[in-house]
Amino acid sequence: MALFAAWHANAEKEPNERVVVAYVTAGKNDVPDPTVMTHINYAFGTVNETFNGVNIQDPDRLKMIVGLKQQNPKLKVLLSIGGWTAGRFSEMAATKENRSAFAKDCKRIVEEFGLDGIDMDWEYPSSSEAGISSSPDDIDNFTLLMKELRHVLGQDKLLTIATICTAQYIDFKNCLPYLNLVNVMSYDMSDPNKQHHAALYPSPISGYCTGSEAVEAHLKAGVPKEKLVMGMPFYSKGRRQDPGIDEFLRTGVLPEGYSHQWSDEAKAEYIANEKGEFVWGYETVRSLSAKCQYILDNNLRGGMYWEYSSDKTGEFRTVLSNMLLNSGPDQHQKRYMLQL
């Protein structure tokens, strides 16, 4: 109890500065610019085969990422454990012995690599949607896992989680005291053949959930704004089997009859076919600027994106950096914002 009380009191004193969280993946050769984000979540580590430790994908790349702190000493680097189809969580969290051993291995990795903390991306407790094992006890066991991780990591390390847009599968009331940030995966929120997977607001082209609805779901679940981080995708998604989209993805040229569209209702960019139907959703400076403005208007903690290397030109991450961390949008972004 003393450790928890001390950590909670310390957390109350920490300044709630705006954050930009970038997921940076293994298996790539790019070197991230450490000046355009506050946090890097390195993806991924996984639960090991004996349910009591962590395997790290491409540990040499993780070492390189940590080395970026020399250029930006304020940069926080975390190991993200999990990801879609990453299993063994249910078995690991099921027993006190496994939870304790797993948490101790996380601490070993944090100390060995010089990390600032751990990000947990279990998709999802009590769900086998991703083809992983699950149990009705997972939600309670997840809370126990967060408690153990906080106890073992101590009060000076970061503990964050990634969550589904609907705020399901997590007992936030009991988890939140142990967490620094909640990264909401406000993308993949539709049948991509029919709707935009990451619209900001409800509209005819929006999916079953939107960015604004994801935020509201988490606020309703009790997540305070100072811990709430809204996710954004740096990738496009849609009706891949559509012949016009197939041609577009191969050549970069839209066939006759297809057009780029902006939904002012959804604050989202998309491609429509010759019938005016949605076929492909994507992000632009304009749509990301709208999401950043939403974060600012609603006083959320910040923005998160998946993932760094998908932004080939760097203009997407520059939007988040300028709007959320610096003085505001540059002239290029202002031109789009006048249309919002």
Model-found features: residue ranges?
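Substrate-binding surface in catalytic domains of secreted glycosidases
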Residues: 21, 49-60, 104, 125-257
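Conserved, mostly hydrophobic/aromatic
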Residues: 40, 79, 120, 149, ...
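Glycan-recognition patch characteristic of GH18 chitinases/ENGases
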Residues: 12-110, 197, 204, 329-337
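Glycan-binding loop/region signatures in secreted carbohydrate-active enzymes
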Residues: 81, 227-294, 319-340
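Solvent-exposed, polar/charged alpha-helical surfaces in well-ordered, non-transmembrane soluble domains
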Residues: 35, 63, 100, 104-112, ...
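Short, well-ordered coil/turn segments that N-cap beta-strands
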Residues: 17-18, 36-38, 73-77, 114-116, ...
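N-terminal signal peptide
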Residues: 2-15, 295
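Structural recognition of alpha->loop->beta junctions
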Residues: 33-42, 98-122, 173-189
